[in-house]
Amino acid sequence: MSRQNPVRSTRGNSLRAREAQQAQDAPLFQESSSNVFVVEKVLNKRLTRGGSEYYIKWQGFPESECSWEPIENLQCDRMIQEYEKEAAKRTTRKRRYSPQPSTSSSAELQPSTSDEWAGKTLKTIIGITKAPGELHFLCKFSDDSVHLIPLREANVRFPSQVIKFYETRLVLQGVSPTIPGGMS
């Protein structure tokens, strides 16, 4: 079922009857040569190659008559500004996507005390972050628990895994690899 724009619609008498009724109710919004419709609400926005379009709910028309309109066809700057302000509020409230699974729904991961992970076997170092003033490794242990370990402690307790972590992420710029045997 396609939705048609009431501005461009030529469906028949029922739409024309509604237009005639609107002309009687609001003569200021009706011109003799062309129809001007009243915007009830701006519902959505999309970007197209031609520019911005807004999804409009027309006053006096059902939800099924909503349509996408280019900004050039609209004369409701205040409503568009209000919609943009509300849309900006909605986007700032959204949380950013993190590929790492969340370990706590309400609080960030806090640095662990050594008794929480003492005696556990380190499975992998996931990442590194600067938590309250110093660097911490985000470590996953064999029991699938995740803890923030201070850099100094990780260097002492898990030196080989720390080196392996750095080696997998180290990128040298401006250094050409040499091939053993004299060729470079």
UniProtKB/Swiss-Prot annotation:
Compartments in which it is found: Nucleus
Assigned keywords, A-Z: Chromatin regulator, Nucleus, Transcription, Transcription regulation
Coiled-coil intervals, chain numbering: none
Keyword Transcription regulation: yes
Region spans: Disordered: 1-27, 87-115
Function recorded in the entry: Seems to be involved in transcriptional silencing in heterochromatin-like complexes. Involved in epigenetic repression. Probably does not act as global transcriptional repressor. Plays a role in linking epigenetic regulation with the innate immune response. Acting in concert with chromobox protein homolog hpl-2 and histone H1 protein his-24, involved in reproduction, somatic gonad development, male tail development and vulval cell fate decisions; perhaps as a result of modulating expression of Hox genes mab-5 and egl-5.
Protein name: Chromobox protein homolog hpl-1
Organism: Caenorhabditis elegans
Species classification: Eukaryota, Metazoa, Ecdysozoa, Nematoda, Chromadorea
Gene label: hpl-1
